[in-house]
Amino acid sequence: MEQYEVVEQIGRGAYGSAYLVVHKGERKRYVMKKIRLSKQNDKFQRTAYQEMSLMASLSNPYIVEYKDGWVDEGTSACIVTSYCEGGDMAERIKKARGVLFSEERVCRWFTQLLLALDYLHCNRVLHRDLKCSNILLTKDNNIRLADFGLAKLLMEDLASTIVGTPNYMCPEILADIPYGYKSDIWSLGCCMFEILAHRPAFKAADMASLINKINRSSISPMPPIYSSSLKQIVKSMLRKNPEHRPTAGELLRHPYLQPYLAESCSCSPIYLPVKPTKSNLGDKQQSRKPGSGRKRIIKTNGSSEALETAAEQAVDTRDNSTYISDVSTVGTQDACISQVSVDPQARNKAYQNIDDLTLFQQIEENLMTITDRQIDEAIFLKAVRTSSTVDVVPVSGAIQKPNEAPIPKEELTIGVVQEQRKEVKAHTHQGSKPGTGDVPIVTEESSPKSAVKLAHSDSTPAEWDHLNIVQQRADALESLLELCAKLLKQERLEELAGVLRPFGEGAVSSRETAIWLTKSLMTPPKLEGSPKLT
């Protein structure tokens, strides 16, 4: 402590405070987190020590850097980390006053967060408290993930204690189901929704309503200025079934994020785009729709081949300013992995050219899926009622006391420790990475049983399928409305009429509409300027 000079207190929590300090020798600013140990039980003290040990073992450019740590005469534990001049993401959103961030900036933040989260999961670490106030920003607007007070090393396949911030908790935690790394993906999805929309993904006046919204994965539409690809990625992170959520590594390999991944300083070769060799260009190719876990085969008929060729030409634009250039390649029998260098201006131009094609590809798949699969309305209503049924079991001191006012709007970090560990079965949850060590987590409240239980939490696969079909219909409608709005704004009335023709009295098949719309989008005109962003 003698090496540091305290400048001011910059934060206060339930168990300690944060101070801005200056290293006397280096004359460099750091943040010192001081955790009170006096009058705390042994489990809490072990948690503080293990947080210090965990921070010392982490090393990633997008995680706050550990500087020093010690125990001050047994009364408090001190952890010194790097100082981020840009504040936290929650403050940045408030200062924006409703002015939305540019998509390029959001995607850059998103990629950095995924790199940090993938690093944690590869090292068997669950963060368990991902929220905007724990996402810090440097003066260069780069991400630093912070606050590992609730983090856990997975000794078993899954965790079972209920910890975190209610607004960012995933359905399986609230349903008292053992959870794994996909719980962090849900929390990050909530953060990304808040960064995009400048409002929480899930917000309610009371805990029961909040749980109901989370259990139904009921979110409002995101701002229309962002691309469908980005919004679909965020939606995929907020799927109720954890098995249907992507991992951080899978998201990093998404084609839409590849340009931003190439700009990162810790880009691993396993995340670089995979390009097929020339010998395979004529074969059938399998592609994944942006922001979705469903696969579709691109058939070798005239219209689909034309669409695929146009998309490839638009992405692989090679003019005076090179969009993508190969730096080094590692050859394999079927494909080669290529590192890429990116020109941001050329990248934006190329994405502008293929924006209509990408949107059409999503509409085509969703419309064809809905046409082929008819939905029984009675089953649909039953599935919705089943997924929205909530049973809240109050426990004294766990969530809210009877005499207290409703939960305030600000976020509250809660935790309920289960005394008896449940036997974890692999087939009841998504697979996760094996662990070797266990970090006991001390939380604010403890109870023999969890405070929140959801009825009908063990949904059958058939119910998941029905809900997925409903989600597909919603995605298709949203994509269709976005395209119609864009065509109307550009006064492309003939194309707009072609899009809406299948819904008239003399409706034609979705396939005929897809072929017609493909031809009309082969040479898309230049889009008008987008709204001014920050």
Swiss-Prot record:
Q: Which reaction equation describes what this protein catalyses? A: L-seryl-[protein] + ATP = O-phospho-L-seryl-[protein] + ADP + H(+); L-threonyl-[protein] + ATP = O-phospho-L-threonyl-[protein] + ADP + H(+)
Its Enzyme Commission number?
Answer: 2.7.11.34
Active site, renumbered = D129 (proton acceptor)
Pfam families per the UniProt record, alphabetical = Pkinase
Q: Which UniProt keywords apply?
A: ATP-binding, Cytoplasm, Kinase, Nucleotide-binding, Serine/threonine-protein kinase, Transferase, Ubl conjugation
UniProt similarity note: Belongs to the protein kinase superfamily. NEK Ser/Thr protein kinase family. NIMA subfamily.
Record's protein name:
Serine/threonine-protein kinase Nek6
